[in-house]
Amino acid sequence: MGWEFFSLETLQELARQYGYGAVFFGIALENAGIPIPGETITLLGGFLAGSGDLSYGGVLIAAIAGAVLGDSCGYWVGRWGGWPLLTRAAQLFNIPQEKLDQARHKFSQNGAAAVFFGRFVTLLRIFAGPMAGIVRMPYGKFLLYNIGGASVWAAITVSLAYFLGRVVTIEQIIAWTTQFSWFALAAVVGMVGIYFVFHFLQKRFDQTIESTIGDRPQ
């Protein structure tokens, strides 16, 4: 993700000029919540490694370190001030505190998976860290899944550009990864929607059963 004025030519120049630093800070800023096209810069780093301008290991380490640092920043922002801010926003939109507490509980149950797999989903990679902080996931647990997810994501992303960059253009690689990331987001939204529909129907069914039993003559 990123602002439109970050043209591919500009990003390529940044990657060539600053190398590992561009990869590190690009993905760190994106994971911290700033809309910098960090994933694209990481792909460019892998592409440059494939052409011999950078080393594969250096790009991989920079991507992992940047992703872990960025998500950790988001975690602490969420932990220190995220819940009060979210509570005030809920009051502004007349969202009951009970609903907010339920959402917090649900995320705390599935937060580890969100932190690990959120790397591969556009938007979720930005919000997983702050949400983990808001629900007060233990930092040790968060860091474990953060490092694990960052390592898998970086290995796939850098390797994809490193190897495929020898046979296809970097523009095509970026297009493929962007499409996959949006598809993953759509899949997550779809699954969440199905869950809430199922939960709603189950609640209505239980209410109907209770009403039927209550209406029976004693």
Swiss-Prot record:
It is found in: Cell membrane. It is a multi-pass membrane protein. Coiled coil: none annotated. The chain crosses the membrane at residues 27-49, 57-77, 115-135, 142-162, 180-200. It comes from the Bacteria. The lineage of its organism: Bacteria, Bacillati, Cyanobacteriota, Cyanophyceae, Synechococcales. PANTHER family: ALKALINE PHOSPHATASE LIKE PROTEIN, UNDECAPRENYL PHOSPHATE TRANSPORTER A. Belongs to the DedA family. Keywords: Cell membrane, Membrane, Transmembrane, Transmembrane helix. Its main location: membrane. One of its GO terms (cellular component) is plasma membrane. This is Uncharacterized membrane protein slr0232.
